[in-house]
Amino acid sequence: YWLLNPANLSGQMKSVITNSVNESAPYNTEYGISPTNSAYGIAGPKTGSDWAKYTTVITENSITGYYNDQKIGTVEITNKVENFGTDLFAYIGKSSYSDMFYKGSVKEVKIYDGAQSYKQVKSDYYNEVLKAAKDGLSIGDTSAVKEDLTLPATLENGVSVSWETSKASVITAEGKVTRPEEGKTSETITLTATLSLNGYTVTKEFEVTVVPWNLDEDLAEAAAQLKLAKVISEDIELPEEGKYGSTITWKSSDDSVLSDAGAIVSRPESGKGNQKVTLTATLSLNGKSVEKPFKIEVMEEFY
């Protein structure tokens, strides 16, 4: 038989072929990567629970194992696969022995009619990793962009990403967004991501629409996003910048209790009850402003 185990009892990749006939204990004839008798092969690498590519190339006189893009090694054999006979059974996730079933997932199984070279194994691995990275690459909803975009420079498995833009005056290759002026039309541009891994590349395009300023809407959104605690017993941190780059200033209705900066000046004595204060935020953006009041209670002293 030929047997592939992503992780044996020692957590190592195992890929072996029986090199002779021993009906009572065929496992003692295993040759290859992590065989039962270590003298008949080489130790496989420790593997993990992440997705990985396991490749075995069997020729008339050798078995070679690969883990992702790394060649583990080659072990000479004398038994040919054709000697296994006909009417053979093949299992995925099940052993020929009375072992427990495989607990994991299998994404894809490929069988070739020829022996792959190391170059081919690496090429397949890199292209598969890049395809998965491309499929998973997202920059969010691009139908009505109002803010700078986060464009990743690196992805999992060592994939690097570079970006190009069709119109840098609207969105730069770093994701900096310049919105059209209020009353103008939206701008639609293309961002192109080039994903690279060890000399292999794929590209993915994103169509991005940048909408013009609408100061009333934008300030309303910025104000809606602004939130404060309703009851406080210690100083609060007041943001000075809001959504879309709006600036925020603050004004307290009673600075003898709570300052404009959010610092508690005095708390009521225990038993006097909480002191109510209104803290008003003024959000400003491109010459327009909107106010948002917050009713806050400064807690009385505990004792």
Give the label of every model feature segment.
Residues 2-11, 15-79:
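Extracellular glycan-interaction surfaces
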Residues 5, 58, 113, 165, ...:
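Residues on the solvent-exposed faces and adjacent turns
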Residues 52-54, 63, 107, 161, ...:
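Residue-level detector of short, conserved catalytic/binding motifs and their immediate flanks
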Residues 127-303:
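Beta-rich interaction/scaffold domains
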